[in-house]
């Protein structure tokens, strides 16, 4: 084909991958590499393909490359990566299944070493499927004691399948912009709390604390937190200043305390992925985008505009750039995983975060003026208080979210019961983490004291 354009070039190596085949070619003497780029559109037409990616030159070689789409693409199932030795060889950090590279290698990355990830791509290119693959990777490998997730889903439907999972920090995905900003604020405060705690106990990071500084018989592990934002553009449109400030601060400081972010957008513009955000998140994934300018925003280089869609992606990090086919996980498989986790595990959610994002106060019932009405209302409160405490004793731990889920209460009403139980000496104070409050009485002791009161 090159001969048709009067360019002497020799194929010196070729390798077929899941999505494309890479051909390495050597130019004849006296020909400039710019000549290859000038015939790109002609090559696409001559080869009857949708797209071609030209690598000029290939680092460390006296050659250039042509990435040409395969007529039949190989599917890279997430299951094959999850069962691979690369994924299961260690439990350290947070292992994520990305996909398969040109030579068929399973590409597994550690989020804790990134320590944050930026994902961008046009609609329908595989971005949402990739996010699901990352989330399911975490669900397969890590318990809620190891990793907890916060899911921000302004589009309201993309991440709804994960609600009420034990691995979530709160039961629902976060949909409202105001709640998302409150979540980011809470995360920065949690980061500060963790660093203050590390200073008090004399350790430098979360791994040191979990592996040596805590009393494993008495103190639970400190879990890592992964924040997933499915569409950054929506947040930046309505609260750019606050969102950017919180995201940058977390990106700069949160690695050692075990807080990580995965931020995705279908609009890789400088208004969404600002210079400050880019400067602090160096691990990035690009799916197919509309233009070379969009590619530069996410990768700092062109190339993503030549990707083929349907999971074809480029991963850029401090270690270099890799093109691969992203892992595929179907919705039916996600539902099966989530249903199994819910059926076999109890959920204990974080009341602190739930409180922080509660923007609309619950409307309290109107008090009845008559003394009879007041007594009746007090009796109702006492009876519900008793049932809530008996539920906590049966479960062995107490939390606002547990009262909400069991009795169908709003947050403020459930909090009122828990605060009353603490004030009467039935429950211990609120603790950091997912362990809930300590129950201070047996069922017999509680019933005896409660009836006396």
Across the structure, where does each feature detected by a protein language model lie?
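Short beta-strand
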Residues: 10-16, 54-58, 429-431
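Terminal-proximal interaction/regulatory segments of ATP-powered molecular machines
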Residues: 1, 11, 359-453
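Short, charged/polar, Gly/Pro-enriched secondary-structure boundary elements
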Residues: 29-33, 71-77, 444-449
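Long, charged amphipathic helices and adjacent flexible linkers at domain junctions
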Residues: 347-362
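N-terminal anchoring/assembly modules that precede and organize ATP-driven motor systems
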Residues: 1-26, 30
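A short interface-forming secondary-structure element
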Residues: 24-33, 38, 408-409
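Short, low-order "capping/linker" segments at domain edges
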Residues: 65-75, 366-369
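P-loop NTPase catalytic phosphate-binding loop
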Residues: 9, 22-26, 35, 44, ...
């Amino acid at each position: 084909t090159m001969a048709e354009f009067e360019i002497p070039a020799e194929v010196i190596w070729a390798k077929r991958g899941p999505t494309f085949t890479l051909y390495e070619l050597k130019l004849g003497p006296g020909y400039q590499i710019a000549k290859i780029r000038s015939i790109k559109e002609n090559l696409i037409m001559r080869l009857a393909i949708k797209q071609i990616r030209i690598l000029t030159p290939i680092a460390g070689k006296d050659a250039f490359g042509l990435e040409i789409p395969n007529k039949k693409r190989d599917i890279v199932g997430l299951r094959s990566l999850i069962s691979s030795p690369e994924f299961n060889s260690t439990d350290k950090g947070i292992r994520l299944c990305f996909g398969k590279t040109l030579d068929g290698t399973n590409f597994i990355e550690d989020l804790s070493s990134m320590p944050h990830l930026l994902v961008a791509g046009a609609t329908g290119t595989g971005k949402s499927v990739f996010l699901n693959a990352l989330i399911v990777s975490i669900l397969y490998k890590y318990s809620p004691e190891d990793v907890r997730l916060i899911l921000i889903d302004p589009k309201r439907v993309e991440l709804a399948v994960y609600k009420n999972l034990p691995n979530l920090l709160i039961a629902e995905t976060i949909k409202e912009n105001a709640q998302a900003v409150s979540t980011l604020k809470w995360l920065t405060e949690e980061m500060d709390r963790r660093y203050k705690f590390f200073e008090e106990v004399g350790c430098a990071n979360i791994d040191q604390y979990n592996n040596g500084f805590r009393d494993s018989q008495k103190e639970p592990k400190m879990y890592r937190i992964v924040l997933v934002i499915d569409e950054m553009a929506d947040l930046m449109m309505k609260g750019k200043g606050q969102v950017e400030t919180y995201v940058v601060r977390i990106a700069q400081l949160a690695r050692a305390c075990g807080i990580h972010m995965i931020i995705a957008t279908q609009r890789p513009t400088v208004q969404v992925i600002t210079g400050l955000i880019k400067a602090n998140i160096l691990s990035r994934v690009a799916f197919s985008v509309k233009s070379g300018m969009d590619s530069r925003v996410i990768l700092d280089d062109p190339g993503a505009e030549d990707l083929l869609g349907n999971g074809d992606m480029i991963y850029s990090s401090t270690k270099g750039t890799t093109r691969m086919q992203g892992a595929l996980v179907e919705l039916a498989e996600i539902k099966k995983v989530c249903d199994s986790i819910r059926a076999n595990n109890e959920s204990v959610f974080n009341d602190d975060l739930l409180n922080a994002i509660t923007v609309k106060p619950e409307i309290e019932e109107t008090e009845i003026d008559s003394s009879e009405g007041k007594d009746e209302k007090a009796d109702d409160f006492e009876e519900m208080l008793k049932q809530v405490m008996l539920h906590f004793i049966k479960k062995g731990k107490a939390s606002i979210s547990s009262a909400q889920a069991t009795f169908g209460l709003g947050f403020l009403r459930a909090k009122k019961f828990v605060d009353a139980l603490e004030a009467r000496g039935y429950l211990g104070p609120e603790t950091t983490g997912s362990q809930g409050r300590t129950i201070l009485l047996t069922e017999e002791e509680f019933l005896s004291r409660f009836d006396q009161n």
